[in-house]
């Protein structure tokens, strides 16, 4: 039987997650999306948003709308390839959402509002069994990154988990390979050159807490903060306290790139590191970590569903004589599409482990 899923927050990531599971052929087979929750419940508007996307193009599946009952004024149900998805009005308290009534088992929390564990636990009181937060979380929620530490999921302990950020999902697989293959990371600085997002301004506006963040996104390179590098220490404990970083928000609508400058724990060469990352991309990290030695630019990675695509051409070794520990690694990621696929993968992984635990 398909697992029953609800998506709280049908904005950019909520829609991308839904489209990702459709793309993977999971809708109605492994996953039954019972409901999507947002402030607006106009199914016709949701259908429009799904059909047409400036970055990712037209949705490949048929989307229509209908009414859940004759008494409602407007269509409040999406119909995608014959599968009905109810549009539910958002609530200030997740506990007030009708997950129990709808039979929802797993909630994908993508509003950006309930990222604290205690707040996200409201979904459990509303009747859901598990919650996946599609953002970094606070308050003790377990952070899981597919391909890195997803195996740490414990059905009896972890009821609210975080899928980390898109940037952590790009950086962590690279660091995971460096550690696993014995290169180690003594210390490192990460910069993400990150596409603008919906939280930014189209023209200069008010941003009291982040003055630079209030400047027009499409015409500026904007320095910003990120906790993505530090978060790697949460999923790879041996790197705890060794990584930090920053972000530059740039005038592109999608695809970002991580620049990791680090000191290895032993002498090595860029050729050895390159070979290890290439090997990992074809074996134990396949589908998570990619490898390219082509002359590619950001647009070439739109709709790439991998978490991190290592760029062999852009990687550097310090040219000082006898310096064999100082390197720069560059890796690309579609911060929308790749990340959304990992949310789907995490839900599937949890469901599989949960089923096994119940046997």
Swiss-Prot record:
Residue numbers binding NAD(+): 12-13, 38, 91, 134, 335
Keyword list, A-Z: Glycolysis, Glycosome, NAD, Oxidoreductase, Peroxisome
The keyword Oxidoreductase is annotated on this UniProt entry: yes
MF terms (GO), sorted A to Z: glyceraldehyde-3-phosphate dehydrogenase (NAD+) (phosphorylating) activity; NAD binding; NADP binding
InterPro entries the record matches: GlycerAld/Erythrose_P_DH, GlycerAld_3-P_DH_AS, GlycerAld_3-P_DH_cat, GlycerAld_3-P_DH_NAD(P)-bd, Glyceraldehyde-3-P_DH_1, NAD(P)-bd_dom_sf
Annotated binding of D-glyceraldehyde 3-phosphate, by residue: 165-167, 197, 226-227, 249
A Pfam family reported for this protein in Swiss-Prot or TrEMBL: Gp_dh_N
Pathway(s) of this molecule: Carbohydrate degradation; glycolysis; pyruvate from D-glyceraldehyde 3-phosphate: step 1/5
Site residues by UniProt (Activates thiol group during catalysis): 194
Active-site residue list: 166
Domain of life: Eukaryota
EC class name: oxidoreductase
Reactions listed under catalytic activity: D-glyceraldehyde 3-phosphate + phosphate + NAD(+) = (2R)-3-phospho-glyceroyl phosphate + NADH + H(+)
Subcellular location: Glycosome
PANTHER family linked to this entry: GLYCERALDEHYDE 3-PHOSPHATE DEHYDROGENASE (PTHR10836), GLYCERALDEHYDE-3-PHOSPHATE DEHYDROGENASE-RELATED (PTHR10836:SF76)
Protein family: Belongs to the glyceraldehyde-3-phosphate dehydrogenase family.
The protein's assembly and partners: Homotetramer.
Name of the protein described by the UniProt record: Glyceraldehyde-3-phosphate dehydrogenase, glycosomal
Organism of this sequence: Trypanosoma cruzi
